[in-house]
UniProtKB/Swiss-Prot annotation:
Record carries keyword S-adenosyl-L-methionine: no
N-acetylmethionine found at: 1
Protein name stated in the entry: Rieske domain-containing protein
MF terms (GO), sorted A to Z: 2 iron, 2 sulfur cluster binding; metal ion binding
Binding of [2Fe-2S] cluster, residues: 57, 59, 80, 83
Cofactor(s) this protein requires: [2Fe-2S] cluster
Domain of life according to the entry: Eukaryota
SUPFAM superfamilies (UniProt xref): ISP domain
Cofactor comment text: Binds 1 [2Fe-2S] cluster per subunit.
Domain Rieske: 16-94, 17-131
Residues that bear Phosphoserine: 6
Organism: Homo sapiens (Human)
Length: 157
């Protein structure tokens, strides 16, 4: 609710940064999980860069914090351990290999499905890691597993 009593649009909410841990800890483990403003996220430290995203895969809610990080076409991706979906760490795009059925001998190429996984901002200050949730106005497929119906279903089972 806003100060005037009107409901706040969750798509336009401004989120504050939340301290999720120490830089030394994530550099050792290369990943950590946290709850930021009631949203589960995973934070990765890969090749000197920090990345944060919703913890559950956009496809079927798989646990991304248990996946491997691999490079596909020069882009670091988390590979969902359930169905091997590839998600770029930097943008949240889902990647797939395209095959030309008219030329089966051609080498498959990596293509984007678009942004499927919500990405969040990571900052470091005085050795502490902070995550700020995305307030991008578009919907991502991973939003289903981070909010609303899925959380209600999950908690009631």
């Amino acid at each position: 609710m806003n100060l005037d009593g009107s409901a706040q649009d969750p798509e336009k909410r401004e989120y504050s940064s939340v301290c999720v841990g120490r830089e030394d800890d994530i550099k050792k483990s290369e990943r950590m999980t946290a709850v930021v403003h009631d949203r589960e996220v995973v934070i990765f430290y890969h090749k000197g860069e920090y990345h944060a995203m919703d913890i559950r895969c956009y496809h079927s809610g798989g646990p991304l914090h248990l996946g491997d990080i691999e490079d596909f076409d020069g882009r670091p991706c988390i590979v969902c351990p359930w169905h091997k979906y590839k998600i770029t760490l930097a943008t949240g795009e889902g990647l797939y290999q395209s095959i030309n059925p008219k030329d089966p001998s051609a080498k498959p190429k990596w293509c984007s499905k678009g942004i499927k996984q919500r990405i969040h901002t990571v900052t470091v200050d005085n050795g502490n890691i902070y995550v700020t949730l995305s307030n991008e106005p578009f919907k991502c497929d991973s939003d289903f597993y981070a909010t609303g119906d899925f959380k209600v279903i999950k908690s009631s089972s």
